Swiss-Prot record:
This is Virion infectivity factor. Residues 75-114 are annotated as: RNA-binding. The modification Phosphoserine is found at residues 144, 165. It is found in: Host cytoplasm; Host cell membrane; Virion. The record marks 150-151 as: Cleavage in virion (by viral protease). Residues 151-164 are annotated as: Multimerization. Keywords: AIDS, Host cell membrane, Host cytoplasm, Host membrane, Host-virus interaction, Membrane, Metal-binding, Phosphoprotein, RNA-binding, Ubl conjugation, Ubl conjugation pathway, Virion, Zinc. Residues 54-72 are annotated as: Interaction with host APOBEC3F and APOBEC3G. Residues 14-17, 74-79 are annotated as: Interaction with host APOBEC3F. A motif (BC-box-like motif) lies at residues 144-153. Belongs to the primate lentivirus group Vif protein family.
Length: 192
């Protein structure tokens, strides 16, 4: 019988970022209690030798599974050192990989109080609204003018430590495009 390959998306992440993610998840599971129902599986509870940890986040009938890996082939840069993260959405027997932005939005919808665009309509109708969003990572678009006005009126409260963001976990801060200086500010360009 021939070998059958299963391909999955694994985001290359440096080890310190994975450690920070694990610490934030454990903090919000056990101390702040904001991550109720989340399940953390340690590396020694997994039968797969490359799995470092798994975080299972229930979403009504589905669940989000964020798996961290170690011992993978080294990445393009020396700081990657074979660490990675995969994000999977599971419902029954159906499984699919999702991107970090969508994962953050799903976590945001199901777990954290939000001062969202529906707050505008609720405020106009005289209903009580949540004063702020506890999970800013779940918002990936610019809101309407009314939404921006309401958020300016009620500033979001920063939580210490921050809530675990999947997008922040896989963010590539090393390969962001460099900002170039303007012509007047560049000392090497004009020889001064």
């Amino acid at each position: 019988m021939e070998n059958r390959w299963q391909v999955m998306i694994v985001w290359q992440v440096d080890r310190m970022r994975i450690n920070t993610w694990k610490s934030l998840v454990k903090y919000h599971m056990h101390i702040s209690k904001k991550a109720k129902g989340w399940f953390y599986r340690h590396h020694f509870e997994s039968r797969h030798p490359k799995i470092s940890s798994e975080v299972h986040i229930p979403l009504e009938t589905a669940e989000l599974v964020i798996t961290t890996y170690w011992g993978l082939l080294p990445g393009e840069r020396e700081w990657h050192l074979g660490q990675g993260v995969s994000i999977e959405w599971r419902q029954g027997r159906y499984r699919t990989q999702i991107d970090p932005g969508l994962a953050d939005q799903l976590i945001h919808i199901y777990y954290f109080d939000c001062f969202s665009e529906s707050a505008i309509r609720k405020a106009i109708l005289g209903h009580k609204i949540s004063p702020r969003c506890n999970y800013q990572a779940g918002h990936n678009k610019v809101g309407s003018l009314q939404y921006l006005a309401l958020t300016a009126l009620i500033a979001p409260k920063k939580t210490k430590p921050p809530l675990p963001s999947v997008q922040k976990l896989v963010e590539d801060r090393w390969n962001k495009p460099q900002k170039t200086r303007g012509h007047r500010e560049s000392h090497t360009m004009n020889g001064h």
